[in-house]
């Protein structure tokens, strides 16, 4: 071998070519913008993505995809959700499970209608028919789905992208109609007048899941006094016994005795039909400073007194049940209304303890009204304006000018006690961002009461992760009312009913449902708008077509998505019903988890899932919700592709985005931002560089011919394989438990602490300096080959592209083209030997202490490389002494040397203290002395040895390197 001369003028030979330097095509930089799409194309061409899961022979695993809405760009919430699902699916595929992940999209509803309307000019809007709107909405949804699908694929998500489920598909809509019919025939679907959350801005009823409750809404808060006109005899007797004699005549009583109520919705007073009290609460009759008497809850006397600005003196006290049957005069109209007994919703936490009851404008009010057969009055139209039933207030908007006019009328009549602004949370339409009201309308409902107990029992049988999810959904199902499933929109699945043109008869039976189901299988829901009634009706009804008109309501979109179990997973032999797992954001306890539960329980008496896993929301680095107004939106597209300024917004690639998902405790809200991405990029770089180092040292190694028996390996290598086995086990457990942040921590620790900082640091001399075929090098290479294959395997569910890139850069022949074809890493029993752990952990602690001492010398510029040092160790710790003895007696003489492990030129155990030392340290381990190494520096291995200059052909080398050079030559 020719040893070239250096260029420094000293005429010294260079031994660089005699070293085993790194060689690999696995680049230091990921170049993810180019490389990741190449790897995705490789998966596609080789049928390695979701097709791998379909080909597996193991048991079926079904993670049922909750459908994102087909509108708008993908955001960090999408990334968190879909990547979590992909990690789980890929792990299951690697375990050999049969996996077919069917992605879905929620396609109906108002937001898409609004997007379509935005694109139309005035003339187009005027000419817009329901079917024209539906065609445009479907086209818009398909376009959005295509864009979102491309984004999901770029993230490395494996799914049956060519066969997704869409809630607008014919077969999906047909299955939904069938489900509706099954619920109807079990008696769970009914039509009735009932207060529902109504959005005047979108003119439709809303489900609870379609509401949001922003802070800072201001309502007019008023205290009002209604005049009492009649008392039951028993109440009069009770008051008389307490010394309170009241006028018997109506006029005299009404001038003297009032009942005080408090409300933040003055506009509901025209619909007042009663006041409700709690039969178990103590109520007082209190005298104000004008000698008027007020009925209020005893516990609220001081608060009411302060609010109305008048001292209130207790005159008499009665239980709430005594007030049942009292009559009062309506404050705005000439009518008499009763006191009634309400439920536990009446408390003494606020107000007066007496509730103004308008059955047409509240659920509790409605239920109480039904109990007492009160009129259900709702004098408000779909746009939020008073109708003629509101008398002089007709035409006023209940959310704008009605409150002011009503308050003025109360002032004029002398009924107003107090008015002031009240800031509180108030239900808003989540789409239009405008306030809603309670409004009684004719709607279609699913009677949750009919199967509530079954639903609660089903909740108990599901595994909820985190466990708090169980309590959350259980309380929601316990407390919820019947589910209003009708909407007054055109873009949706119709409620398949017919109404008689004369009278109030509704046509809904098995024959009509079966016929409409068959039509929808063939034509989709558009048939409801495109076909005449004669064709929508079964043949035996077609002659009566002129007597019927079809319904105009569509189904709540939560009924759409909540039907996915019947439309998707229960219809495929490749999927499980109930699904093994549902995984969505924590807001879905009131959304998809619940709607799916209710429909499945109603029809099949069990939940559609065995396990439910929830995640939090993606926030900015300061814990704030992302919004355009705050300018804090983190765009996943920019994370992958970079911004305009690549220095400020680098192109990190999909794997860094995926690494972020694995790094967070997703059970709570999770932060993301530039600083976090920068830190994650550093972690990713360390993992990548570790893999590159492993690959770079395998360029001339083939385990088929260079492999060794595990039992013949040095102690250091045996320990490293045992540690690798432990890490594979721990990562496996983390994936089984969906604890991906533990995977992240384990991966980081393994690559940085176990490999880079310890094993590979020690291995540099073995790998670079040894002769290519030396045992000390081949044994290390064998271990590196075993590790790199396992490393690629365990990171593949998360760092999918990087794992594949590693696999394709392994220089020796593998049986599998893809890391995913190897399946989940297996660890032979021969790797496992925990007897090495204690002594090596002790020596690692010693190494840490020595490194600190060496660093102290470097800081004082007394040392450069650690190989310039010699170390004397005088252990006082018996455990350490035993570990050093174990190494000396059992270690391989070419590898397991303490000076190699400490990366110094000489180590002395015990003996007399050295005369000349750079540093002395004494701690629990014992005494550590650092001295300058004697001898000269070998120009090849950089060790300091006493024999430098003794070899004529290589005067600058130590004896070990001379031997290696001569063997290479």
Curated annotation (Swiss-Prot):
Pfam families: Anticodon_1 (PF08264), tRNA-synt_1 (PF00133), zf-FPG_IleRS (PF06827). A motif ('KMSKS' region) lies at residues 625-629. Belongs to the class-I aminoacyl-tRNA synthetase family. IleS type 1 subfamily. GO terms for biological process: isoleucyl-tRNA aminoacylation. Monomer. One of its GO terms (molecular function) is tRNA binding. ATP binds at residue 628. This is Isoleucine--tRNA ligase. One of its GO terms (cellular component) is cytoplasm. It comes from the Bacteria. Binds 1 zinc ion per subunit. The gene is ileS. Keywords: Aminoacyl-tRNA synthetase, ATP-binding, Cytoplasm, Ligase, Metal-binding, Nucleotide-binding, Protein biosynthesis, Zinc. A motif ('HIGH' region) lies at residues 68-78. Its EC number is 6.1.1.5. Its cofactor is Zn(2+). IleRS has two distinct active sites: one for aminoacylation and one for editing. The misactivated valine is translocated from the active site to the editing site, which sterically excludes the correctly activated isoleucine. The single editing site contains two valyl binding pockets, one specific for each substrate (Val-AMP or Val-tRNA(Ile)). It is an enzyme of class 6 (ligase). It is found in: Cytoplasm. HAMAP family: Ile_tRNA_synth_type1. Zn(2+) binds at residues 938, 941, 958, 961. L-isoleucyl-5'-AMP binds at residue 584.
């Amino acid at each position: 071998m020719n040893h070239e001369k250096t260029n420094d003028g000293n005429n010294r030979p260079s031994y660089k070519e005699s070293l085993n330097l790194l060689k690999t095509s696995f680049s230091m930089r990921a170049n993810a913008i180019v490389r990741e799409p190449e790897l995705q194309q490789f998966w596609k061409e080789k049928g390695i993505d979701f097709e791998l899961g379909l080909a597996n022979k193991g048991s079926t695993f079904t993670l049922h995809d909750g459908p994102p809405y087909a509108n708008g760009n993908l955001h960090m919430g999408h990334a968190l959700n879909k990547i979590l699902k992909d990690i789980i699916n890929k792990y299951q595929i690697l375990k050999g499970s049969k996996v077919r992940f069917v992605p879905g999209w929620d396609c109906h509803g108002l937001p898409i209608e609004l997007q379509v309307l935005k694109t139309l000019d005035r003339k187009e809007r005027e000419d817009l028919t329901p079917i024209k709107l539906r065609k445009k909405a479907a086209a818009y949804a398909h376009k959005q789905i295509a864009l979102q699908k491309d984004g999901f694929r770029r993230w490395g998500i494996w799914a049956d992208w060519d066969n997704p489920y869409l809630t607008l598909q014919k077969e999906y809509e047909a299955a939904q109609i069938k489900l509706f019919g099954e619920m109807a025939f079990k008696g769970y679907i009914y039509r009735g007048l009932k207060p529902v959350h109504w959005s005047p801005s979108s003119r439709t009823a809303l489900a609870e899941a379609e509401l949001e409750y922003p802070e800072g809404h201001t309502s007019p808060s008023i205290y009002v006094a209604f005049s009492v006109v009649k008392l039951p005899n028993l109440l009069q007797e009770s008051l008389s016994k307490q010394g309170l004699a009241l006028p018997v005549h109506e006029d005299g009583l009404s001038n003297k005795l009032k009942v005080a109520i408090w409300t933040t919705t003055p506009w509901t007073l025209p619909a007042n039909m009663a006041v409700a009290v709690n039969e178990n609460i103590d109520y007082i009759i209190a005298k104000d400073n004008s000698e008027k008497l007020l009925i209020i809850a005893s516990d609220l006397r001081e608060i009411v007194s302060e609010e109305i600005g008048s001292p209130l003196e207790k005159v008499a006290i009665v239980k709430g049940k005594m007030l049942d049957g009292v009559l009062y005069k309506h404050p705005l109209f000439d009518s008499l209304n009763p006191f009634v007994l309400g439920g536990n919703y009446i408390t003494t936490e606020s107000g007066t303890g007496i509730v103004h009851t308008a059955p047409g404008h509240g659920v509790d009010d409605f239920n109480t009204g039904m109990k007492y057969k009160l009129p259900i009055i709702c004098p408000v139209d779909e746009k939020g304006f008073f109708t003629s039933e509101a008398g002089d207030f007709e035409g006023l908007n209940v959310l704008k000018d009605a409150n002011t006019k009503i308050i003025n009328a109360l002032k004029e009549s002398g009924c107003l006690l107090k008015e002031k602004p009240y800031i509180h949370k108030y239900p808003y339409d989540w789409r239009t961002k405008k306030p809603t009201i309670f409004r009684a309308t004719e709607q279609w409902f699913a009677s949750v009461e009919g199967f509530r107990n079954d639903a609660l029992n089903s909740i108990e049988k599901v595994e909820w992760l985190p466990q708090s999810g169980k309590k959350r959904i259980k309380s929601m199902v316990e407390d919820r009312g019947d589910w209003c499933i009708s909407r007054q929109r055109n873009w949706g699945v119709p409620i398949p009913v017919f109404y008689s043109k004369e009278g109030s008869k509704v046509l809904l039976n098995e024959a009509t449902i079966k016929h409409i189901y068959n039509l929808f299988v063939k034509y989709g829901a558009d048939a409801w708008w495109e076909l005449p009634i004669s064709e929508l009706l079964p043949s035996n009804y077609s002659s009566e077509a002129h007597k019927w008109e079809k319904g105009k309501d569509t189904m709540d979109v939560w009924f759409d998505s909540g039907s996915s179990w019947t439309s998707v997973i229960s219809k495929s032999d490749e999927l499980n019903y109930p699904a093994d797992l549902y995984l969505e954001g924590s807001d879905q306890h009131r959304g998809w988890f619940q709607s799916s539960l209710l429909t499945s329980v109603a029809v099949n008496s069990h939940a559609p899932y065995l396990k439910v896993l929830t995640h939090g929301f993606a926030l900015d680095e300061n814990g704030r919700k992302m919004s355009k107004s705050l300018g804090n939106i983190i765009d996943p597209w920019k994370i992958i592709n970079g911004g305009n300024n690549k220095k400020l917004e680098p192109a990190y690639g999909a794997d860094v985005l995926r690494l972020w998902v694995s790094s967070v405790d997703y059970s709570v809200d999770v932060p993301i931002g530039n600083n976090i991405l920068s830190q994650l990029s550093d972690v990713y770089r360390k993992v990548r560089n570790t893999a590159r180092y492993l690959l770079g040292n395998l360029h001339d190694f083939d385990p088929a011919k260079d492999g060794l028996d595990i039992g013949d390996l040095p102690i250091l290598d045996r320990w490293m394989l045992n540690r690798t086995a432990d890490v594979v086990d721990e990562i496996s457990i983390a994936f089984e438990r969906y604890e991906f942040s533990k995977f992240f921590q384990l991966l980081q620790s393994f690559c940085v602490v176990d490999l880079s900082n310890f094993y590979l640091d020690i291995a540099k001399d073995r790998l670079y300096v040894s002769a290519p075929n030396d045992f000390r090098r081949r044994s290390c290479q064998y271990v590196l080959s075993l590790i790199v294959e396992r490393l690629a395997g365990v990171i593949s569910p998360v760092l999918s592209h990087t794992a594949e890139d590693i696999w394709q850069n392994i220089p020796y022949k593998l049986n599998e083209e893809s890391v995913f074809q190897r399946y989940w890493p297996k660890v032979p029993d021969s790797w496992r030997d925990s007897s090495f752990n204690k002594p090596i952990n002790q020596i690692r602690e010693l190494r840490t202490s020595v490194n600190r001492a060496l660093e102290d010398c470097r800081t004082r510029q007394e040392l450069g490389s650690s190989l310039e040092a010699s170390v004397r160790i005088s252990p006082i710790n018996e455990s350490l002494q035993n570990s050093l003895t174990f190494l000396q007696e059992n270690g391989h003489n070419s590898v397991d040397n303490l000076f190699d492990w400490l990366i110094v030129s000489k180590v002395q155990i015990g003996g007399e203290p050295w005369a000349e030392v750079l540093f002395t340290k004494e701690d629990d381990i014992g005494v550590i002395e650092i001295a300058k190494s004697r001898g000269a520096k070998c120009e090849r291995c950089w060790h300091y040895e006493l024999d430098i200059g003794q070899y004529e052909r290589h005067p600058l080398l130590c004896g070990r390197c001379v031997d290696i050079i001569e063997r290479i030559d």
